[in-house]
Amino acid sequence: LSLHDALPIYKVLRLTMLLHDVAKPQMKTVDADGVAHFKMHDVKGAEVAKRILKRLKFDNDTLGKVTKLVQYHDYRMPAQPKNVRRAMNKIGEELFPYYLEIRKADTMAQSEYMREEKLSNIAGIERCYKEILKKKECVSLKMLAVSGSDLIADGMQPGKQIGAVLQALLELVIEQPEYNTKE
C-alpha cells in the first residue's frame, strides 16, 4: 500500500475520530445515582456527522464511510466468530479493519476503568476477524455460494422473493459458515 493509496483512509479515520462523539452532549442523561449515560449517541452522531460533512462538501465516498464508522464506533460484541461475521456484515468488509482501529483508539482515550478487558476483547475480535478472512467465510451476499441466477435456474420466479431468500441464506451462513455451499 503506497502512501498515496493510504491517504484517503487516513482522512476517513481522522474525520471519524473527530466526529465520533459529536452527539454526546445532546444525548446525555443522568440517572438517579448521578451516573451519566449517552444512549444512542452513535446513531445521532452519524446523523450530525453526515450533515457536517455535507455542509463542508466532502465527497460521497468519504461521507458514507465516516458516517458508517461513527454509527458503529461503539458497537460491542463478544469475541466469537459468529458475532464478528455478523458485525462484518453490518459494518462492511472494507470498513471492518478501520472499525477495529477506531475501537482501539477510542478505548485508549477513555478512563483506565476496564481498559485492559476492553483491549483484550478487541484483540480477540481481531483474531476472529483474521481467521474469518483466512477461511474466506461468507459475510456478505456477494460471498454466498448461491446467487439469484442459481435460484432462477432452479425454478424460482424472478422478483423480490429471490432477495428475501438470499438474505435468509446469508443469515444462516453467517451463523453456520459450513452451510455456504451450492447444495
Give the label of every model feature segment.
Residues S2-L7:
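Short, small-residue-biased leader/transition segments that mark boundaries at the very start
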Residues Y10-H37, H41-A49, L53, N60-M77, ...:
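His-Asp-centered metal-binding catalytic motifs of divalent-metal-dependent phosphohydrolases/nucleases
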Residues Y10-R14, T67, E94-I102, S120, ...:
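Active-site lining segments that contact anionic ligands and/or coordinate catalytic metals
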Residues T16-V22, H73-D74, I91, I102-S111, ...:
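Generic structural signal for hydrophobic core residues of well-folded globular domains
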Residues V22-V30, K44-K50, M77-N83, L100-A109, ...:
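Short acidic (Asp/Glu) and glycine-rich catalytic loops that position anionic groups and cofactors
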Residues T29-H41, K57, R86-G92, E116-S120, ...:
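Short, contiguous acidic/charged loop-to-helix segments that flank catalytic cores in large enzymes
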Residues K50-R55, A109-E183:
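Charged substrate- and nucleic-acid-binding regions of tRNA-handling and nucleotidyl-transfer enzymes
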Residues F58-E116:
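Histidine/acidic-rich helix-loop-helix segments that form or flank divalent-metal centers
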